[in-house]
Amino acid sequence: GDTYLYENPWTLPLGFILPDIVETGWKRDLSSPADVQNDLSDVLGVPECLIFTDGEEQGNRFSFTAPEDGEYYISVANRQIDSVKLDVGGESRSIDTLKRGYLVETGYVKAGTLILLESNDSAGSMDASAYRFDEAGLRALYERLNQHPFELETLGEEAMKGTIDA
């Protein structure tokens, strides 16, 4: 079969220095992983990576229409819901183990595409939110985190040596 190799231009080094505000100001216990990610961006003073997108929730269903082309994610805050059906423009798939609290990835969708998430569990409202991934936000976050990188000098089986300019 065909093999594809992609370059990730925003790979962080083994280590880097974070400003003190990250330890004291970053809220890591928010109910949505998207909110945790965006709070890190806010604390570091860079644009958010995940842009909130309006959606509508009715019972065990959450839906939204993509306002622009992009990669979208859905956060389900109700941790009692474990299994959902995702429908993106008429193509459906099942997603299990949602209780772990990860984001549901819709993939790249065109503007005007209807996205529907339906719970298979009878656990009440999903309390769902949709987000569009913003590449410029990720680039800004990467650049902020990579301001003081760990420069690896040597790497052995039991140790590594390097420097960080602070």
Sequence positions of predicted segments:
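Flexible, solvent-exposed extracytoplasmic
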Residues: 1-166
